[in-house]
Amino acid sequence: MARADGRSDDALREVRITRGYQDWPAGSVLVEFGRTRVLCAASVQEGVPRWRAGSGLGWVTAEYAMLPSSTNTRSARESVKGRIGGRTHEISRLVGRSLRACIDLAALGENTIALDCDVIQADGGTRTAAITGAYVALADAITWLSAAGRLTDPKPLSCSIAAVSVGVVDGRVRLDLPYEEDSRAEVDMNVVATDHGTLVEVQGTGEGATFTRSTMDKMIDFALAGCSELSRIQSEALAAPYPGELPGGAA
């Protein structure tokens, strides 16, 4: 069965990365995977969590949330409910540890970079879009910190990080699932990888069926190829000058 949007099984949706979407954070990005849109902001904060104080190491943390109207049925804000849901906690932790995989925390000194990922519109793959966009916001925050003279190493990023969903739908392995496919997938997987082709995290579940080792291998092959293309798109976005004003008027 053909995909509703006409893509081949191994094709990404149209991906757009817009840097400098907000004026105030050190890094901000609007990332779009098809109709999924996520605003990713990287804010620099002096100091680190209490358990890390005195270590000389920095920290990178993340918070993920969905706007009430990001889906076709409005959901109440978790702040109004009085508790953060398990899914939100899980994805926030995933984004944070994915981005920590690419950075030398010692180079930050005792500074924290907080990544806020807010889903404006959800059509599948929000967590993978958040990771992909958050890396670009993080890279811009590193540029800002470097201009401010607050890094002990001018190049603390060892690689880029991207993520994509992959699954089995209608018996076929498919890349970058929109909601229409994700909601009926027999197998669902999220893959986080570096631009070197190494894996950061793999989350896979047989939602409606078990799956074979050969199917898993094909899914990971599709995902790594997709992450490679996403890394290229990230690199193109970051090739342009820093989109805001740097400390000290640096260009």
From Swiss-Prot:
One of its GO terms (molecular function) is tRNA binding. Its EC number is 2.7.7.56. Phosphate binds at R87, G125, T126, R127. Keywords: Nucleotidyltransferase, RNA-binding, rRNA processing, Transferase, tRNA processing, tRNA-binding. PROSITE patterns: RIBONUCLEASE_PH. It holds the Pfam family RNase_PH. Disulfide bonds: none annotated. It catalyses: tRNA(n+1) + phosphate = tRNA(n) + a ribonucleoside 5'-diphosphate. One of its GO terms (biological process) is tRNA processing. It is an enzyme of class 2 (transferase). The keyword tRNA-binding applies. InterPro entries: ExoRNase_PH_dom1, ExoRNase_PH_dom2, ExoRNase_PH_dom2_sf, PNPase/RNase_PH_dom_sf, Ribosomal_Su5_D2-typ_SF, RNase_PH, RNase_PH_bac-type, RNase_PH_CS. SUPFAM superfamilies: Ribonuclease PH domain 2-like, Ribosomal protein S5 domain 2-like. Phosphorolytic 3'-5' exoribonuclease that plays an important role in tRNA 3'-end maturation. Removes nucleotide residues following the 3'-CCA terminus of tRNAs; can also add nucleotides to the ends of RNA molecules by using nucleoside diphosphates as substrates, but this may not be physiologically important. Probably plays a role in initiation of 16S rRNA degradation (leading to ribosome degradation) during starvation. Belongs to the RNase PH family. Homohexameric ring arranged as a trimer of dimers. This is Ribonuclease PH. It comes from Saccharopolyspora erythraea (strain ATCC 11635 / DSM 40517 / JCM 4748 / NBRC 13426 / NCIMB 8594 / NRRL 2338). The lineage of its organism: Bacteria, Bacillati, Actinomycetota, Actinomycetes, Pseudonocardiales.
